Amino acid sequence: MTNIRKTHPLMKILNDAFIDLPTPSSISSWWNFGSLLGLCLIMQILTGLFLAMHYTPDTSTAFSSVAHICRDVNYGWLIRYLHANGASMFFICLYAHIGRGLYYGSYMFQETWNIGVLLLLTVMATAFVGYVLPWGQMSFWGATVITNLLSAIPYIGTTLVEWIWGGFSVDKATLTRFFAFHFILPFIITALVAVHLLFLHETGSNNPTGIPSNMDMIPFHPYYTIKDILGALLLILTLLALTLFTPDLLGDPDNYTPANPLSTPAHIKPEWYFLFAYAILRSIPNKLGGVLALLLSILILIFIPMLQTSKQRSMMFRPFSQLLFWTLVADLLTLTWIGGQPVEHPYIIVGQLASILYFLLILVLMPTISLIENKLLKW
């Protein structure tokens, strides 16, 4: 009798995706982040569901309902902080996953890559609307500042902002719709993840060398299931350490003050995972220019397959490209630091230089150095 996992219509899909999937034998721990992102998504949906059972999306009770969750609900404090810090772990895994794709040339699977960029945008949107829900000072002002950026769009900007707000300022209508978005988006993300995997399994995984490995494949189970379990344990350990020892390390103290439209915080800034984009936005003195730079800082990922000039797919054997890649990583860390600093000298000029370098590295320096490396191959 044939095994049920190979004949049952539903089990067959799972079998082909997670059990008998032919996988390159040489993929490193950088390939763990895909499964870790899946784990993060499941954790966020589960903790979010339990939070939604006790949360009230109303301006007069939102803040106190979060306090109620932390004080009165059984293990409510744990669920709340797992959800908040789970978002940080989600973004750490996301950025590592994208970095892996850039380094090893995984972006050459164009459909998978484009769905991935769409996923990144959706996750960022989810995190943004979620940050507004506790209705603290930074929630309110973050929502006001970021939604206000749309007013930079010529002609329709102001109308668009008021339409999103559901009034003339961030108020009850805004909070209610943001809660609705925050609830529905994770399920849209889950559907996109299925499409992401569908496209990936059409081609099979890339590997560190960037060379087709069709002649050297091993089954996903047990080799990579056990490897993914190790990664998952390390992720959960890190998340629990963060949540139980320093739950507020990555949060903003201003969010422990209820939202007050009459009092603006000294420094309005988003969560740490958006700071690099926020720094790029602030480094341009023109509103529309800043918004365009902000958009382009993320959407530039779509153009990366078109900027591939190297004859080799991976950076594994390209030391000059490696140097530029790690310069880009350092540049993004610099932008993240600048995004959290006040707008004053010397941070302004450092932010502007880091922003210019970011676009210069991706659009000019990396494609150029790849061409030079091609020439060196002929020696």
UniProtKB/Swiss-Prot annotation:
What is the originating organism of this protein? Lagenorhynchus albirostris (White-beaked dolphin)
In terms of domain of life, where is this protein from? Eukaryota
Instruction: Share what the entry says about its subunit structure, partners included.
Output: The cytochrome bc1 complex contains 11 subunits: 3 respiratory subunits (MT-CYB, CYC1 and UQCRFS1), 2 core proteins (UQCRC1 and UQCRC2) and 6 low-molecular weight proteins (UQCRH/QCR6, UQCRB/QCR7, UQCRQ/QCR8, UQCR10/QCR9, UQCR11/QCR10 and a cleavage product of UQCRFS1). This cytochrome bc1 complex then forms a dimer.
Q: Which Gene3D superfamilies match?
A: Cytochrome Bc1 Complex, Chain C
Topology in the membrane? Multi-pass membrane protein
Is Iron among the key words of this record? yes
Chain positions recorded as heme b b562 binding sites: H83, H182
Locate the residues binding heme b b566: H97, H196
Protein known as: Cytochrome b
Note from the entry: Heme 1 (or BL or b562) is low-potential and absorbs at about 562 nm, and heme 2 (or BH or b566) is high-potential and absorbs at about 566 nm.
Family of this protein: Belongs to the cytochrome b family.
Question: What InterPro entries does the record tag this protein with?
Answer: Cyt_b/b6_C, Cyt_b/b6_C_sf, Cyt_b/b6_N, Cytb/b6-like_sf, Cytochrome_b, Cytochrome_b_C_euk/bac, Cytochrome_b_N_euk/bac, Di-haem_cyt_TM
Q: By its UniProt entry, which SUPFAM superfamilies does this protein fall under? A: a domain/subunit of cytochrome bc1 complex (Ubiquinol-cytochrome c reductase) (SSF81648), Transmembrane di-heme cytochromes (SSF81342)
List all membrane-crossing ranges.
33-53, 77-98, 113-133, 178-198, 226-246, 288-308, 320-340, 347-367
Q: Which gene encodes it?
A: MT-CYB
The record's subcellular locations are: Mitochondrion inner membrane
What's an example GO cellular component term for this entry?
respiratory chain complex III
Record Pfam families: Cytochrom_B_C (PF00032), Cytochrome_B (PF00033)
The answer to whether keyword Amino-acid biosynthesis applies is: no
Which cofactors are required for activity?
A: heme b
Q: Which UniProt keywords apply?
A: Electron transport, Heme, Iron, Membrane, Metal-binding, Mitochondrion, Mitochondrion inner membrane, Respiratory chain, Transmembrane, Transmembrane helix, Transport, Ubiquinone
